[in-house]
Amino acid sequence: MIIRLTVVCTRYNVTMEILCHKDTECVVSDETIEIKVASDKVRNKIKEFCRFTRVSVKEYPLVHKLVISRESKKVFAKTFNNR
């Protein structure tokens, strides 16, 4: 599975594509993006991307879930099946 995260700001757009296992879940709602991923490496990449783009992210380590807030900036997530 591939997760594409895009942050749209006034002067620039930042996009990151992450290759994940098939057991990864990504749920997009109006207020948050919830990514449930077991890999520490993938979680750290997502957290560093959010830190770079200054988007708030909450981590729930017991359930391996990251929650990205969509309120301050335009944050989009899209998933693709890896073939």
Feature roles, as predicted:
Residues 1-83:
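Thiolate-centered catalytic microenvironments shared by cysteine-dependent enzyme domains
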